[in-house]
C-alpha cells in the first residue's frame, strides 16, 4: 500500500486521481488552498484520506503540509504536482501580474513542492514525483504563450530533477494529457486583461475553440487516473506519460517536424565547431 500526496484536489484531475487511489487500496493526502473544498472527500474516506491546506506559491505552506502528512501517515511514496491553471491570451495582451502569477503556480510551484519533498524521498531512499504537464508543452498554441511556456519549463526542470535524484531511488514522471473532460476551461482558465483586437484571428480564435469544445473533450479523467496509477506501479515508469489519442498524434507530428527541420539545417548548423 502506497501513500500519495496530491496538490490541487478540489476538482478535476486531482479529485479524480485521489478517488482512484482510494479505490486502488492506497492512502492519500489531499490538498487545496481552501481546506473546505477537500474536507468532503476526507468525510467519504476517513480511514484512507487526510486533508491539508496548501498553496504552491507559499513555500512555508508546502513544507508544513508535507511534514504534517508524513507525520500522519508515516511515509509518503508518491507526490503529485497537479495544482495549476491556464492563462489564455496573446503575450501582448497579458499583464505582468498575470504572467508572473501563472508562472509562479505552474512552474515555480511544482519546483517548490519537489524541493520540499526531496529530503523526505532522499531520506527513505525512494519516491515518485508525478508532475502534470500539458499538450501545449509538446508544441504550443497561439494564446497559450505563458501557460504552455510554464508547463514546458516544468517538464525540462523535471528531467533535471530525475537525473539529480536517481541515485536516491527517486523517480519522476511528467503526465502529458490531451483535451480531457474536466472543469479546466470553465473554472481554471484565466483570460488576458489587455485584449488587442488584431489578435482575434490567432489567440482569440483559440479561445473560441476551447469554449466550443468544453464538455465535449474526448479524454476520460477516470481512465487517465488509472494510467497514472499503472505508471506508479511499474518497475520502469516512463519519464513522459502521454495520455489520449490527440496528445499521441500531436507528439508524433512534432517529432517528425523537429527531425525534418534538424535534417534540413544540418549543412548550416553542423560545421560550426573549431576545425581540429
Question: What are these model-derived regions, one by one?
Answer:
Residues 114, 150-153:
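Active-site helix of classical SDR
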Residues 10-12:
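Conserved glycine-rich cofactor-binding loop
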Residues 24-40:
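Conserved glycine-rich Rossmann-like NAD(P)H-binding loop of the short-chain dehydrogenase/reductase
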Residues 54-64, 96:
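The beta1-alpha1 cofactor-binding region of Rossmann-like NAD(H)/NADP(H)-dependent oxidoreductases
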Residues 134:
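Residue(s) in the substrate-gating loop at a strand-loop-helix junction
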Amino acid at each position: 500500500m502506497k501513500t500519495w500526496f496530491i496538490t490541487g484536489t478540489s476538482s478535476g484531475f486531482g479529485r479524480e486521481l485521489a478517488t482512484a487511489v482510494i479505490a486502488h487500496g492506497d492512502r492519500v493526502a489531499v490538498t487545496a488552498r481552501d481546506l473546505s473544498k477537500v474536507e468532503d472527500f476526507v468525510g467519504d474516506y476517513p480511514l484512507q484520506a487526510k486533508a491539508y491546506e496548501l498553496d504552491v506559491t507559499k513555500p512555508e505552506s508546502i513544507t508544513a503540509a508535507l511534514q504534517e502528512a508524513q507525520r500522519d501517515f508515516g511515509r509518503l511514496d508518491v507526490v503529485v504536482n497537479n495544482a495549476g491553471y491556464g492563462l489564455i491570451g496573446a503575450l501582448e495582451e497579458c499583464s505582468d501580474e498575470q504572467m508572473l502569477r501563472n508562472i509562479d503556480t505552474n512552474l515555480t510551484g511544482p519546483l517548490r513542492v519537489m524541493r520540499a519533498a526531496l529530503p523526505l524521498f532522499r531520506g527513505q531512499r525512494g519516491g515518485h514525483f508525478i508532475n502534470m504537464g500539458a499538450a501545449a508543452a509538446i508544441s504550443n498554441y497561439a494564446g497559450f504563450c505563458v501557460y504552455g511556456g510554464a508547463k514546458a519549463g516544468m517538464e525540462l526542470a523535471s528531467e533535471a530533477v530525475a537525473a539529480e535524484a536517481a541515485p536516491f531511488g527517486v523517480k519522476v514522471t511528467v503526465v502529458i494529457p490531451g483535451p480531457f473532460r474536466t472543469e479546466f476551461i470553465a473554472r481554471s482558465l484565466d483570460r488576458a486583461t489587455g485584449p488587442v483586437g488584431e489578435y482575434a484571428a490567432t489567440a482569440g480564435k483559440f479561445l473560441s475553440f476551447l469554449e466550443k469544445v468544453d464538455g465535449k473533450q474526448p479524454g476520460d479523467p477516470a481512465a487517465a487516473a488509472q494510467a497514472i496509477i499503472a505508471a506508479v506501479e511499474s518497475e520502469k515508469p516512463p519519464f513522459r506519460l502521454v495520455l489520449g489519442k490527440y496528445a499521441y498524434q500531436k507528439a508524433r507530428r512534432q517529432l517528425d517536424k523537429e527531425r525534418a527541420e534538424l535534417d534540413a539545417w544540418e549543412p548550416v548548423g553542423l560545421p560550426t565547431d573549431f576545425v581540429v
